Every structure is written in structure tokens, then in C-alpha cells.
């Protein structure tokens, strides 16, 4: 840390709206839009080609197609999201199926401690299993009442809103439960293995 | 694949020079207190602190070559309603200091492989310029060409430095006497510039990058050889 450095002539103008001050993690700024950041081309997945699989250290590997996924119980997340590129979107909502609901069917084995999420197109990200359970994560197909747009990961993306948003893998198709942490795409490319925005865990070693 | 140099802590850099690249973009030449190695394509995080302790961070691509060992350069496109870019463009000048950390990113980096096609839209040229400059300084034998799309001549960064290795396209208006009418990149432009078995680096606004990545797929590039970096406030 730099202790006391002041940027000459800087006063700032993106302070969060009144009443939302406590909702911005360190180093984040308030963004009213929904920026798009993706590695490589934007995937085009039709719902009739869409599948979601939960495998690895589970009692039953389970695979859903779009129709069987739509038949699962649904819940909504109301709150904030934080991107490692510094923007935070406050007061948004997503709905879909909680990861708890998926794991209820797959039944994790006791030694499962980590999850590697894989997307159509091959993107991967790793998340501790504890960060995906107890109502903290979803496979979301709806954003603010509308089908999730393709550029935001539609038809469905992982949603782990308490971690930086690269963990919320767009176009997710597989959750693999593992005993050991296996780093995903950004985690191998300089980004933090867990990514807690409140601890500002942006990069490897933060 | 070699690992890219990883990020170090915050430090104060001296702004040793600053100059406009276009009416709305400025390059800052920064001398680091504790220099680090980096690869072309990596970026830095800049942190501004107000007198009341309020801080703002943003990321900026490095424009200079790692072979330029004495300082790094970042080019900042001024966003009209931005918080940090107007400060960097309008307020900060040579003799000031700037807090930053880097180098960041291990994906959109050039490690010397070839052949390489660079496609930049607007200020998306910045990290590509680091690659172009580094190739000129260290690896002139690596085949490399650039397609650069800008709205008007006034939006073109590094105009005096782009040579035969860069092809320019104007989407709104070209310079006086420019032979082509204004237009966007076409499938034929990308197909003509494509290298079989090459890497492609694409950087620019989201819509531009999406469109170019699709054109590269059509031109036969597999997705894993299309490296993208998307810019833009929304």
C-alpha cells in the first residue's frame, strides 16, 4: 500500500448512490449498465442443444436437457454483482435453479471439496464447493425477468454473486466435483483462485 | 507455454512525459519505482486517491514494448462521462505521479509465436501496438500484420508509426483522397489477411470484437487461436 498518496487534482465522481455506500467492495465503482466481457467468441447455444451435467465425486452423475432443467424448482437472487474489471452492478436480479437443487439429485460424496465449472466453448473456472451451496449459487437462465441474453451467457450461466463475476461461468454445461482444487482458465492466467471481492482477491497472491 | 510475469504490489510511478495521440487520447510515459518484466498485451491497474480517501481503480493496456526498458507507456482514451480517463487525459501531466500495479493478465499476451494477425477497433489498438512494437524491436522475422478499424482519421492512434504492416479501414470518413468509401470490416478483409495456422489477437469495443471473432471463425481460425479483449464502458 502506498500510505497517504493523494492523486493531485483528483476528486472522484463515481461514488455510489446514497444508501448504497456499504455495498461497494474495495476498488469497485458503481455501474448502472451491464458490461460484457468474454474470453474468445460469444457462444451460440440453442436450447435444444443445451445440456447441463453434474459429475465427478457424486453418487449419481446427472444430466439435464433444457426441458428437464426447466422442470426443476426455481429461485431468484436479488442483490449485487462485482466484476474484477472494477465495475459493480447493484440491485439486480437473476433467477434459475440453485446449485443446492442440482446437488440434491447428484449427492456429493464426502471427499468432494471443490468444483470445476466448464462452459460450452471450453472456458473453465474453479470454485470451492462451500461457495456453491446453502443458497449462494445458481444456474441462472433469467436476468431481470427476461431470458438471459447470449452475450451474458444465455441460455444459462453459473451465478456465484458473492465472488468476482468471472466465477459465474457463462454458457455453463458441466459442474465437476473434485477432492483437490483444479485451477480454471483465468486462475491459470494470473487471477485469484477464490476471488472474494470483499477481500479484494483479484490476482494470484492477493 | 511460459507463464506471463505475475502482478506485483502497488507502487508510485513518475509521469516522465505525456502527449496527445488524438484529440481524445493521451499517452503517459511512466517510470516505475520498482520496474518489472512484462509481455506485450498485459495491462496495469491504476488507482487514484482523492483527498477524502475515496479511491478509483481502472485497467489500462500497456502500449510500449517490453524491450523499451526505461519506462512503460499507457494510452488512455478519454470517455466523456468517465471518472478516471478524463483525469488522466486532462489533469495529469509530466512531473506528476501515478499509483499503479502490474503487470496483469496471462491470456491476451504475445509470447513471440507467429504468424500473427492483429485486429483492432478504435482504442483497441493499444495492446496490439505493444505487440507490433515488440515484434519490430525483437522479432522482425515473425510474420505479422494488423487490420485497424477507426471511425475517422482523428480517431487513429499512433498514426505516424503504422507502416506497411498495418491496413487501415475508416468506418465513418477517410482522410482526404482516401480511395475507399467508409465501411466496416468484411469477411473478405479478414479472409485476405488470415494466416493459416496463425494466432489472432482482437481488441476493441464488445460489438466489434464479437463481429471480428465470428469473421475469424468463418476464415478458418479455431476458437482457441482467437484471443480477444473487449473494451468499453458498457
Functional labels for PLM-detected ranges:
Chain A
Residues 2-206:
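Structured, non-membrane catalytic/scaffold regions adjacent to prosthetic-group chemistry
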Amino acid at each position: 500500500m502506498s500510505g497517504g498518496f493523494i492523486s493531485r487534482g483528483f476528486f472522484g465522481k463515481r461514488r455510489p448512490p446514497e444508501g448504497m455506500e456499504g455495498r461497494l467492495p474495495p476498488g469497485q465503482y458503481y455501474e448502472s449498465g451491464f458490461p460484457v466481457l468474454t474470453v474468445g467468441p460469444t457462444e451460440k447455444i440453442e436450447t435444444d442443444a443445451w445440456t447441463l451435467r453434474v459429475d465427478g465425486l457424486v453418487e449419481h452423475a446427472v444430466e439435464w436437457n433444457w426441458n428437464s432443467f426447466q422442470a426443476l424448482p426455481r429461485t431468484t437472487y436479488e442483490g449485487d454483482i462485482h466484476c474484477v474489471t472494477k465495475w459493480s452492478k447493484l440491485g439486480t436480479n437473476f433467477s434459475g435453479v440453485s446449485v443446492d437443487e442440482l446437488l440434491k439429485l447428484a449427492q456429493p460424496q464426502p471427499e468432494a471439496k471443490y468444483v470445476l465449472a466448464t462452459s460450452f466453448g471450453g472456458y473453465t473456472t474453479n470454485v470451492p464447493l462451500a461457495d456453491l451451496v446453502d443458497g449462494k449459487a445458481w444456474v441462472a437462465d433469467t436476468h431481470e425477468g427476461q431470458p438471459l441474453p447470449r452475450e451474458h451467457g444465455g441460455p444459462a450461466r453459473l451465478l456465484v454473486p458473492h465472488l468476482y463475476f468471472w466465477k459465474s461461468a457463462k454458457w455453463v454445461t458441466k459442474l465437476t466435483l473434485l477432492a483437490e482444487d483444479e485451477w480454471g482458465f483465468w486462475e491459470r492466467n494470473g487471477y485469484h483462485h477464490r476471488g472474494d471481492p470483499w477481500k479484494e482477491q483479484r490476482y494470484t497472491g492477493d | 507455454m511460459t507463464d506471463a510475469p505475475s502482478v506485483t504490489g502497488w507502487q508510485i510511478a513518475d509521469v516522465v512525459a505525456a502527449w496527445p495521440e488524438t484529440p481524445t487520447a493521451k499517452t503517459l510515459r511512466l517510470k516505475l519505482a520498482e520496474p518489472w518484466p512484462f509481455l506485450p498485451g498485459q495491462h496495469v491497474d491504476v488507482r487514484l486517491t482523492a483527498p477524502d480517501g475515496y479511491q478509483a481503480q481502472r485497467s489500462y493496456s500497456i502500449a510500449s514494448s517490453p524491450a523499451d526498458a526505461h519506462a512503460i507507456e499507457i494510452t488512455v482514451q478519454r470517455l466523456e462521462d468517465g471518472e478516471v480517463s478524463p483525469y488522466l487525459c486532462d489533469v495529469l501531466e509530466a512531473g506528476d505521479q501515478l499509483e499503479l500495479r502490474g503487470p496483469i493478465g496471462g491470456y491476451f499476451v504475445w509470447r513471440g509465436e507467429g504468424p500473427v494477425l492483429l485486429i483492432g477497433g478504435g482504442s483497441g489498438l493499444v495492446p496490439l501496438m505493444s505487440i507490433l512494437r515488440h515484434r519490430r524491436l525483437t522479432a522482425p522475422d515473425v510474420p505479422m500484420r494488423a487490420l485497424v478499424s477507426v471511425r475517422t482519421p482523428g480517431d487513429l492512434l499512433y498514426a505516424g508509426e503504422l507502416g506497411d504492416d498495418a491496413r487501415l479501414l475508416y468506418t465513418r470518413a477517410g482522410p482526404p483522397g482516401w480511395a475507399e468509401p467508409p465501411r466496416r470490416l468484411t469477411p473478405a478483409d479478414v479472409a485476405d489477411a488470415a494466416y493459416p495456422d496463425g494466432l489472432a489477437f482482437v481488441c476493441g469495443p464488445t460489438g466489434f470484437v464479437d463481429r471480428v471473432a465470428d469473421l475469424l471463425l468463418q476464415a478458418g481460425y479455431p476458437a482457441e487461436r482467437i484471443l480477444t479483449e473487449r473494451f468499453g464502458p458498457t
